[in-house]
Design a protein with these regions (language model features):
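A non-catalytic, helix-rich entry segment at domain boundaries
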Residues: 54-143, 147-148, 249
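Flexible loop/turn segments at secondary-structure boundaries
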Residues: 33-36, 146-150, 177, 185-189, ...
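Active-site-adjacent bridging/hinge elements
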Residues: 21-34, 90, 94, 175-194, ...
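A generic secondary-structure signal for well-formed alpha-helical elements
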Residues: 22, 30, 34, 55-67, ...
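C-terminal, charged and often intrinsically disordered regions of DNA end-processing helicases
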Residues: 1-62, 280, 291-292, 300-305
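Metal-dependent nuclease catalytic regions and adjoining charged, substrate-binding loops involved
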Residues: 205-210, 215-307
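Secondary-structure capping and boundary motifs in well-ordered enzyme cores
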Residues: 15-23, 40-51, 78-82, 86, ...
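Non-catalytic protein-protein interaction segments used by genome-maintenance enzymes to assemble
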Residues: 135-223
Length: 307
């Protein structure tokens, strides 16, 4: 059975795809279909994101265990480690050189990508963490997972939910912090946990990045037995003086900043289990999403036959 063993886990990304559109989940995750257009159009964004994540991992591994790491981050930047890590990331993720050594001069779009990654990492991200340095970095790119037991009718399933967290910190107040790096436009607001799973229009309510980060928080909270603070680092926007990486929940015009996963854990985990029960219910087909707001840029329109 898929997603019930160590070799084939259900990732947070796959889970949030199902929340938005079960049929897209079927095409994308179960059948593993990929259109040529999807691959062509996404290569630049994927390349940029992969290079940034690899460079951040290489750089922040050098801060592991440093409390209040502003001095360490400043030292690394002054020693040129940002540039070195970006070049190593390009060598590893783009050219496939496992030793991280560039063997040729860069040209065209790769030069542009390198310059932007250097700016996002060496200025936006480092400046933010230097200013807000009340943390100790625990791990980068850590594989995490947990078993979620569910029952569907007479059948029982142990769902293996697993992924790779970009960064885990310990905060001075004793919390763990899970950070997900993003290179797109900030989307940190949501209208309550229920809206993340059932809200419409789908494209603007079922925020995949928030769902994914809450799933990482759920896994870490269960595994470590500690409270977790979920945060999204939209690195392109961290240069703003008023930038905050924390989620803002707004219900009935009342807003609150989500400082603790525990504040939403019961409701969120109920929704996760209910979604998994639906996913594994043999009598429920992989259907099209309820409205077409999420269909505009979907690469499966030609085979979906939505009317």
């Amino acid at each position: 059975m898929r997603f019930t063993g160590e070799e084939w886990a259900l990732s947070p990304t796959a889970f949030s795809t199902y929340v938005k559109c079960p049929l897209k989940f079927y095409f994308d995750v179960v059948e593993r279909l990929r259109s040529d257009d999807e691959l062509d159009e996404s290569v630049d964004n994927m390349t940029f994101g992969n290079i940034f994540h690899e460079a951040a991992d290489l750089l922040y591994k050098q801060t592991n265990g440093y409390a209040d790491p502003s001095a360490r981050l400043t030292e690394l930047r002054e020693k040129g480690e940002v540039e070195k890590c970006v070049d190593k990331a390009i060598a590893k993720t783009y050219f496939g050189y496992k030793d991280g050594v560039l063997r040729q001069e860069l040209g065209g779009e790769l030069i542009i990508i390198r310059n932007i990654v250097r700016e996002y990492l060496g200025q936006n991200l480092l400046n933010y963490d230097i200013k807000n340095d009340d943390f100790t970095e625990v791990a980068t790119e850590r594989k995490i997972g947990m078993i979620v037991p569910i029952r569907v009718g007479e059948e029982s399933f142990d769902i293996h939910l697993a992924g790779r967290s970009d960064r885990i910190d310990t905060l001075k107040n004793g919390q763990l912090r899970v950070i997900d790096y993003k290179t797109g436009k900030p989307r940190l607001n949501y209208a309550g946990i229920e809206s993340l799973f059932h809200g419409e229009p789908i494209a603007t309510t079922r925020e995949s990045n928030i769902i994914n980060t809450l799933l990482y928080s759920m896994i870490i909270s269960h595994n470590e037995g500690k409270d977790v603070c979920p945060e999204l680092y939209y690195v392109g926007s961290m240069v703003r003086k008023d930038y905050s990486p924390r989620f803002v929940e707004t219900i009935d015009r009342q807003s609150r900043t989500l400082d603790s996963y525990a504040d939403v854990a019961p409701e969120f985990e109920d929704e996760v289990k209910e979604t998994l029960r639906e996913m594994f219910n043999r009598s429920i087909p992989f259907r099209q999403c309820e409205d077409d707001s999420a269909c505009k840029y979907c690469d499966y329109q030609t085979i979906c036959n939505r009317k």
